[in-house]
Regions:
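Rossmann-fold cofactor-recognition segment
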Residues: 27-43
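Alpha-helical substrate-binding/gating segment
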Residues: 144-149, 162-190
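NAD(P)H-binding glycine-rich loop region in Rossmannoid oxidoreductase-like domains
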Residues: 40-76, 103-105
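SDR active-site strand-loop-helix element
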Residues: 6, 26, 61, 96-102, ...
Length: 191
């Protein structure tokens, strides 16, 4: 599978990049195959247009994972996501997997904040993308993926209950990408 990972240098992106070593990473941070800011990138730039045109799937992780970040960060995440969805549609990318969160529908009596609303918008964009023939988008409500497993015993119970280890993370992303656990394309999945 030819995979592009937007947000390849973040906590989850690095894990997916390791699991899919032939993928192309796009990130604002150094170390990515393509260094670009989704807020300002020219998607017609040859290297990006070629990566998207050749992609079987794009994984979009290039958003803040901080539910308490200022609202303008989450507004920008929505704008960046919309730009990426439009570029994928133009390039004919058959599948997009976008990281959502259970903050889109919070538990424990918490109210939905800008972070949660931004995830709802990304879920709506995924549904809209999937309306076109030959296209599919999955909004995956990712659990808590700490930077280090050392954080798990220190976390409150509600967060530990939502913990995804690397095995679960990779299993869920493979499924969202239409792959079997051993990395083969699942029967009936778009290429």
């Amino acid at each position: 599978m030819r995979l592009v990972i937007a947000g390849s240098e973040g906590n989850i992106g690095r894990r997916l990049k390791a699991a899919f070593p032939d993928s192309i990473g796009i990130d604002v941070r150094r170390g990515a195959d393509i260094v670009a800011d989704l807020a300002t990138v020219d998607f017609s730039r040859a290297v990006i247009a070629e990566a998207l045109t050749r992609a079987d799937a794009v994984v979009h992780l290039a958003t803040s994972a901080d539910p308490d970040a200022p609202d303008d960060i989450h507004w920008q995440a929505v704008a960046n996501g919309a730009r990426l969805f439009a570029a994928c549609a133009h390039a004919g990318v058959p599948r997009i997997v976008v990281a959502s969160s259970d903050w889109a529908e919070p538990k424990n009596g918490m109210t939905t904040n800008a972070y949660g609303q931004s995830k709802r918008v990304m879920e709506a964009l995924s549904a809209m993308y999937s309306l076109a023939p030959g296209r599919d988008a999955v909004a995956l409500r990712v659990g808590w993926v700490p930077v280090s497993v050392d954080e798990v015993p220190l976390a409150p119970d509600w967060l530990r209950d939502n913990y995804w280890d690397d095995a679960r993370l990779l299993t869920e992303f493979r499924r969202a990408l239409g792959l079997t656990d051993d990395g083969q394309l699942r029967a009936g999945s778009p290429p």
